[in-house]
Amino acid sequence: MRDWYLGLDDPLTLTLAADFRLSQPDYLNDHIWELEPGSGDPPALLLHTTYGLRARSMRIFPRFTASGATVTAPASFAAPPRLRRFYPNFLSLNFSPFTGVEVLAEYWIPASQTIAGRLTVMNHTNQPSEMGLELCGLLVPIEGQSLAQVQIQSANVLAGRTSDLAPVIFLTGGPLHGPGPYPSLTLDLPLEAGASRQLAWTQAALGEPQASFELARRTAARAWDAERARIELVNAAQTVEVQTGDPDWDAAFAFSQKTAFSLFFPGNERLPNPSFVMARQPDHGHSMRGDGSDYPSLWSGQSPLEAYYLASLLPGAGELAEGLVRNFLSTQEKDGFVDCRPGLAGQRGRWLSPPVLACLAWQAYQATENEAFLAEVFPPLLAFFQAWFAPAHDRDGDGVPEWDHPLQTGFEDNPAFNLWHAWAQGVDIATVESPALAASLYRECRSLIQMAEKLGRSEELEMLQFRAVALRIETEECWNAGSAMYHYRDRDTHRSLAGKALAKRRGSGKLKLKRSYTAPVRLLIRVQTKDKAFRRLEVTIKGQTSSGAQAELIKRQDVQWHMENAALTSREVYTQLNEIEVAGLEPNDQVTISTVDYTQEDQTLFLPLWAGIPEERHAASLIERGLLDTDRFYHPFGVSACASLPCPPAETICLSVQMPWQQLIGEGLLTYGYYSEAAQLIARSMNAVILNLKQQHAFYRAYHAERGVGIGERNALAGLAPLGLFLQTLGVQFLPGSRLRLSGKNPFPWPVTVKYRGLSVTRRSDQSEVTFPDGRTVALSDPSDTLVCPE
């Protein structure tokens, strides 16, 4: 494994959590820690947690004393901390608190309720050294007591209580209680010239002090070197090492894999295989109800788009992607329905999963070549695909289904369908046909066709090929040459009209409109109240439809509310509007009436490119006039979620860069041979990632397209560096049996070396060199499309 040398100004993210590959993390009671080298309070080499918000804070840090001087802050060290190794549950750092004295600090989480550390102190001078160590602990409880210096079974420890936990800190070597300003355990460390000394500490937090003490003492007695070797072996077997011409990129890709692995929990009776959470931070991991049903959305189930992205981040762990597919399919019902958010506590999203599961399964198969897996999942995936064409989802029966809820789209904040913000349109998504859904179904269909061909399932092939042709035609009908974009269209009229404001008023009453339309329109009525009090809102629309006079009543139970905002979409489309009556409002409530706007542009409308639908001419126009337009989508830090910014409050949504969507868009660029553009997109995204890893020591859920600053949750899955897209753009795919597929050539500005399980490939601008685990090398001229085998 690579030996790093990362300082505080380099890309870093130092969260620690129990690793599901090496232990059994507790989904309901999981303690997550983060190392803050110098930026915490006090400024120290500070480990901190909140035990999932059961304490205001718990902090552990060392203090060093020599020749009457005491240092705590890394900025005061003779040599600042340098990160040498990092894994999901392990960190090691080197530093020198004083000149000539080096410390190797290791941190390890062996299980969810404990953390351990080991300090190796080395005297590199030619004189004896007298140094003192204090291990300090600061607990700010919510309910309970701060850490106190106590004895348990004649051992000096620090113990406290917060909520239902009784944390205990234990230090080997027979420490005394420290005299300093913080609760601490202290040891004298006399060292001869060239000598070293090693000691370990542990913290455990169970329900009672005695149980915590016993767990801490047992953990301190574990064989550190053997445990570290095991950690390194497991990670070496599943991690891809990347060496580019930019060490910041290398670190970002390595931290992305570390973080991605840390998001997994083992399967249980609710989900049969390991599943993931969206982020794993010190404030997470505690279920007050004790069953996980109260967890927020970040911990409430695996979602399909994030599962697809996560699989691309872990090219060395294809079996995990197989397990994610099986988890989704474990929720399947007789009609083919598969839930969109199955969770480890039995959570369900209650909506049909978006059609990316066959794509995920095919991606997993390409990594593992496990044909038995394909044979197992093909029938249920086919049933799932067909479920999308049931009348409940294809309401007009035209073969182009509609989304049921914005959650399914992977872009829940889409302003076209977002109810939560007054500035968003908020139309009922079930009244809209989206080229993104049609394209996803087409791509799903193509994946099923590939499976059927591999498995020799000729009976299903004909039906799938017919579906694929129909979906492609319908998606292309959404193409708008003038804007060089695909557009949404109305479910019933199949038209993509621009929206128009019709009227405004305050409070209940009638609006006389007297408007006629050549092309039928659908109405959108938005209400903004002055307070959060419930309104018995009802709306009556009178006008003409294609079937004659119509009086449509929208009852209060059909109105969608969020805080002070409500949005109502008419069920009918109208050729003439006569009168709209609004009832149940207060006098100062604002009512706005408009026709639905189908011309709003967002990142989901690039999915036809990902699916490989447009012909070359349309694809070139979509890429060059749409995607790469700097006045619409293309920004210094990536492709923005929306083409325009309706108002300043919309900035964090419309100008956000979301990595799963960069992945899909980048894959679309590669499909049409735009390798240089894909490399540039990766570079822009990486600039945002690295900026935040350096300044904030964290990934973020999204990034600002113009400024690069992080948006949303820290260290979220959706903000990890796009390793999968990078490898695809580089043209490197590792296969079982030390085999390697190379395609194209290196479009990046420097040579790139990628290593996996002893296999190494270096891609330069015009040639590649492959080194097998036995040392044999093969040189190839690029561009190439070659399967490289060890024999």
Where are these regions (language model features)?
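Extended, well-ordered alpha-helical scaffold segments
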Residues: 213-228, 248-255, 317-330, 371-389, ...
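Secretory-pathway/luminal and periplasmic proteins that interact with or process carbohydrate-rich
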Residues: 143, 334-338, 387-396, 473-484, ...
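Short secondary-structure capping/junction motifs at helix and strand boundaries
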Residues: 127-132, 321-322, 368-378, 389-400
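Substrate-binding groove/exosite segments of carbohydrate-active enzymes
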Residues: 233-376, 433, 599-614, 620, ...
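Non-catalytic carbohydrate-binding regions of carbohydrate-active enzymes
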Residues: 455-497, 520-522, 528-599, 603-606, ...
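Gly/Pro-rich turn-and-neighbor structural signature
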Residues: 242-260, 268-272, 466-491, 508-517
